[in-house]
Structures are given as structure tokens and as C-alpha cells.
């Protein structure tokens, strides 16, 4: 049963100590991007644009899958090891 009488001494953490880090040109260049962290705009923002790109990427993957599965037949596109090995 916990009684709150621990023999462990609490470690004293110096809150004033902060490691300075390394300042690099790339870090200086990317600093404005990090200044916007945590700020959320009201509304949908760019969610609609992101959804459009996700749908386009899904359609691209579906087309690739159909070509690979030979569900989508294209002229001069065949999926066999022999045609992949031919040097044109």
C-alpha cells in the first residue's frame, strides 16, 4: 500500500540550464517554418486540396495495379519476364 513515505530523494533539475545547440545555415533557413508550429487556423484550410491529391494518388496506384494484373490492356505493354528481359 502506498503511504507516500518514499526514501528516494527527488532529483533537483536546473531549469535554467538550456543547451545552446548548433546554429547552421539550414536551421536558419528553416526557422520561419517552425515558427508556425502549433498554430491552427479555423475552418478546413488545405484539407480539400490534400484530399484531391490523395484521390489522384489512389487513382494512379489503381491504374498501376490494373496494368500489372492485366485488367487494363494497353498496346505494347505486357507483364512477363521475357518482355522485361528484351533489350530494344
UniProtKB/Swiss-Prot annotation:
The modification Phosphothreonine is found at residue 3. The chain crosses the membrane at residues 48-68. Phosphorylation is a light-dependent reaction catalyzed by a membrane-bound kinase. In vitro phosphorylation is incomplete. The keyword Metal-binding does not apply. Keywords: Chloroplast, Membrane, Phosphoprotein, Photosynthesis, Photosystem II, Plastid, Thylakoid, Transmembrane, Transmembrane helix. InterPro entries: PSII_PsbH, PSII_PsbH_sf. PSII is composed of 1 copy each of membrane proteins PsbA, PsbB, PsbC, PsbD, PsbE, PsbF, PsbH, PsbI, PsbJ, PsbK, PsbL, PsbM, PsbT, PsbX, PsbY, PsbZ, Psb30/Ycf12, at least 3 peripheral proteins of the oxygen-evolving complex and a large number of cofactors. It forms dimeric complexes. NCBIfam families: PRK02624.1 (NF002728). This is Photosystem II reaction center protein H. The gene is psbH.
Amino acid at each position: 500500500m502506498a503511504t507516500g513515505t518514499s526514501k528516494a530523494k527527488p532529483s533537483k533539475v536546473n531549469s535554467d540550464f538550456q543547451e545552446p545547440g548548433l546554429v547552421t545555415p539550414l536551421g536558419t533557413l528553416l526557422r520561419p517554418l517552425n515558427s508556425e508550429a502549433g498554430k491552427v487556423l479555423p475552418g478546413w484550410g488545405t484539407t480539400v486540396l490534400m484530399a484531391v491529391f490523395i484521390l489522384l494518388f489512389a487513382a494512379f496506384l489503381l491504374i498501376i495495379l490494373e496494368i500489372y494484373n492485366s485488367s487494363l490492356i494497353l498496346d505494347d505493354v505486357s507483364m512477363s519476364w521475357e518482355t522485361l528481359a528484351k533489350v530494344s
